[in-house]
A protein has these predicted regions:
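Core catalytic alpha/beta fold that binds nucleotide/phospho-ligands
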Residues: 1-258
Length: 258
């Protein structure tokens, strides 16, 4: 999982994306939406240069691997450039740490098949909000959601937080942060299970929230220490899922793999 603070202007970001992605970004009227769209695609290319993103029938992102490597930006280095504005909190790697090369073979049907240590990274989760973009890649279904930690949920909270869930709020967690943590967790699960029409209040239920050890980022990332690490247990669509949440620079982030 990687989180990107969007410091770049639109033109430098566009240079890290394919022509098709640049055209798709241009369809957004709002400059912020164009930046966020370009940023998460650039981050995907930095993490996994061989991959592009498409969408399934439900609109969720999926990884695709053009076998000929066509339409790949020539200046993508296969690593994480601009090291001051990206961090991978699950590994401690930051933006000047280069991604490992991922070898490919092909199936008898001609489809690209990843091999080696990171095989097969078939799943992707994406989120972007207020000048940040996040991408998670995994061999298993995965999802991520980010939101400003100080978002005002005073009117909406009752539509996605049950009294039982409210009672789970850890004493050490600031009261104003709790709704953002729950919102991100439920949004991540909604994207994870990919079943349209689920109710955040009734169908996606948080059953446990436990503090985790706060982690310190390596020097040179440009990010302060990650805060408010929590592990959440969530039930949805007959499944029990484990998620991890943290805050950094006023952004709440929750992600899960499994």
């Amino acid at each position: 999982m990687a989180l990107w603070r969007i410091d770049e202007e639109e033109t430098p970001l566009a240079s890290l994306c394919t022509v098709a992605e640049q055209q798709e970004a241009a369809a957004f009227a709002a400059p912020r939406r164009r930046l966020e769209y370009l940023a998460w695609h650039a981050l995907l290319h930095a993490l996994l240069p061989e991959a592009h993103a498409a969408h399934d029938p439900e609109g969720g992102p999926v990884l695709v691997f053009p076998s000929s490597g066509q339409n790949t930006p020539a200046n993508i280095p296969g690593g994480l450039p601009h090291r001051q504005n990206c961090i991978r909190p699950d590994t401690g790697l930051h933006k000047n740490a280069r991604s490992e090369n991922i070898p490919f073979q092909h199936t008898r049907f001609g489809d690209p098949l990843q091999t080696g240590e990171f095989a097969p990274l078939r799943h992707i989760g994406v989120s972007h909000a207020h000048g940040y973009a996040a991408v998670i890649l995994s061999a298993q279904p995965c999802a991520v959601d980010i939101e400003p930690a100080d978002s005002d949920f005073s009117r909406a909270a009752r539509r996605f937080i049950s009294p039982q869930e409210q009672a789970l709020q850890p004493c050490a967690l600031p009261e104003a942060l709790f709704p953002a943590l729950v919102w991100c967790a439920k949004e991540a699960v909604y994207k994870w299970v990919r079943i349209s029409g689920l109710s955040l209040l009734h169908d996606i239920r948080i059953t446990e929230i436990h503090p985790e050890t706060t982690r310190t980022n390596p020097s040179g990332t440009g990010f302060p220490a990650l805060e408010a690490f929590h592990r959440l247990t969530v039930t949805a669509a007959g499944k029990t899922l484990q998620l991890h949440g943290f805050t950094v620079e006023g952004i709440c982030c929750v992600y899960g793999i499994g």
